[in-house]
Amino acid sequence: MASYHAYWTVDNVRMAENTPNWSHACWGSKLRNFSTMFEHGDLIYFSTIDESGRHSLFSKLVLDRFTGTREQTEPLIPFSLTNVPFDAYWMGKKPWNTLFDIPFRELALTLDFASGKKLPPNYNGQNLQKIRELTSEDVLAIEELIEAYIG
């Protein structure tokens, strides 16, 4: 099992916030290798940066299984994927999280990532576009942050 950080645009987060019955039940992407780049049990932490530059951690998802297309995934979840432009989906293990809002910039600057490449001091959403594998120390720090904010 591996752990990763993934970035969503603030528009994607707002779409989730405004979707009736939304929970982080699945994760979609247009990446060609999306079905094979992860495996059952992988843990994904999601963050976003808003227009004012505030970086927030907003969800985490433990991957359960690759479900395929939007048409194959939508019957399995309690909300519509009609406005979501992705071609492939992973389902998350239950219970599914709702959104949380945890300040993340200070901690993000300390993350080593498996690559050993830290974020630059003045990072923005462009620096977070690539899905990054986390170290076990990174995961521990993120979990401690989540615990401090939401228990």
Regions found by a protein language model. Name each.
Residues 27, 32-33, 70-151:
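Contiguous surface segments at macromolecular interaction interfaces
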Residues 48-54:
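Short, charged beta-turn/beta-strand-edge "cap" motif at the junction between a beta-strand
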Residues 37-39, 54-57:
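Short glycine/proline-enriched turns and hinge-like loops at secondary-structure junctions
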Residues 1-40:
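Short N-terminal edge-element motif at the start of the domain
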Residues 56-67:
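Short beta-strand-centered aromatic/proline hotspots
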